[in-house]
Amino acid sequence: MTTSGTRAAHRPSRRQWVIEAATELFATQPPDEVTVADIAARAEMTSAAVYYHFSSKDQVLVEGMRVFAAALREQVESLTEAHRPGSDIGPVVTGLVVWLSEHRSAATVFFVSSAGMSQEAEALRHEIRTQLLDELVRLVGKGREPVSEAEAAVIGLGVLALLETAAVSQVRGDDVYRSLGHRSFLHEVGRLAERIADPAAE
């Protein structure tokens, strides 16, 4: 602590505190209404300390998205690696939705709040979407054998669209999510994932 009661700027952990504080704010307010002063207050730092790590609030937003995206990608890779060949992919997709619910603020920022905020944010979203698609195609290949590369790519796109839609529905708590409740929502997401992956199984 400094004598003013705020946190010092230079410690490595302070950068993560800034990201976490900003993520909480961006998840509950329109990002264009959040100021560096707001972020500093939430992080119990001065604005100067925030600027020590980031040049602008937009940079904080993108870095928070990058941290979340890396964790999401790692989760997808881990679940895909552990997936038993030939088994349904529904549990993997619902597992991802559960993970997103456990990281609600960051998921809200990534899938909802940051949309259209900047070219850098959109470029990052596109980059991560491509990486997730590659991993989901690999998952489809493990879940359905044999499957052609083209078919796996199409199915992977469908699963990615489902995952993104489920993520938005969940973080917004929209009518569909509220009417089903969390448990039934997960069940339906898993069932839809399996139908997308193997329509003939219905």
Residue locations for each model-derived region?
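N-terminal intrinsically disordered/low-complexity leader segments
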Residues: 1-13, 20, 24, 140, ...
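C-terminal peripheral helix-coil segments that are non-catalytic and often amphipathic
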Residues: 1-2, 98, 102, 134-142, ...
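Helix-turn-helix
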Residues: 13-17, 21-59, 63
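Hydrophobic/aromatic residues within well-ordered alpha-helical segments
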Residues: 14, 57, 64, 68, ...
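Pre-recognition alpha-helix immediately N-terminal to the DNA-recognition helix
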Residues: 17-25, 71, 91, 95
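Hydrophobic alpha-helical connector segments
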Residues: 63, 77-105, 146-147, 155-159, ...
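Amphipathic alpha-helical packing segments from all-alpha helical-bundle domains
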Residues: 70-73, 119-144, 153-157, 180-191
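Short secondary-structure transition hinges
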Residues: 98-134, 168, 172
